[in-house]
Amino acid sequence: MKLLGTIIGSAFFLQAVSGFFFDSGHQNRQQQQQQQQQRDVGSYQQMFLDNDCPHYLCPQTLDCVRQKSDCACPFPNSQLKCNLPNGQVICISKPATHDPTLVEIYDDPVMGPAQRTEGFRDCGWILDVYDGKI
């Protein structure tokens, strides 16, 4: 009976100790992440405020352009820039395809956004959604 009591007592003790170390490590990691995020926000904010762009400063890339619609997508190698009829612009992932011709078209900054390929979620598909066709 004494052995059973020792085993149960040890189990509770180990559980409490592991909970203490896990929780302490978890809080420390969370605190470090919060500090890093605050630094990132602070440096972004400082770059945004220190920018002397006389026109429009793109919020995602900090590029200085004439107008909002001239902003590039933040990841142009993997995104298409789709222009909506209301003047807004959205960036979507380029469709995944193994067809070299389509890859070349989607990589072209002029032809890619104008492409409308059946079965692909490209800018043509986005316009269909915008128009309520899908």
Curated annotation (Swiss-Prot):
<dbReference type="GO" id="GO:0036503">
    <property type="term" value="P:ERAD pathway"/>
</dbReference>
<comment type="function">
    <text>Probable component of the endoplasmic reticulum-associated degradation (ERAD) pathway.</text>
</comment>
<dbReference type="InterPro" id="IPR034543">
    <property type="entry name" value="LCL2"/>
</dbReference>
<keyword id="KW-0732">Signal</keyword>
<feature type="signal peptide">
    <location>
        <begin position="1"/>
        <end position="19"/>
    </location>
</feature>
<comment type="similarity">
    <text>Belongs to the LCL2 family.</text>
</comment>
<protein>
    <recommendedName>
        <fullName>Long chronological lifespan protein 2</fullName>
    </recommendedName>
</protein>
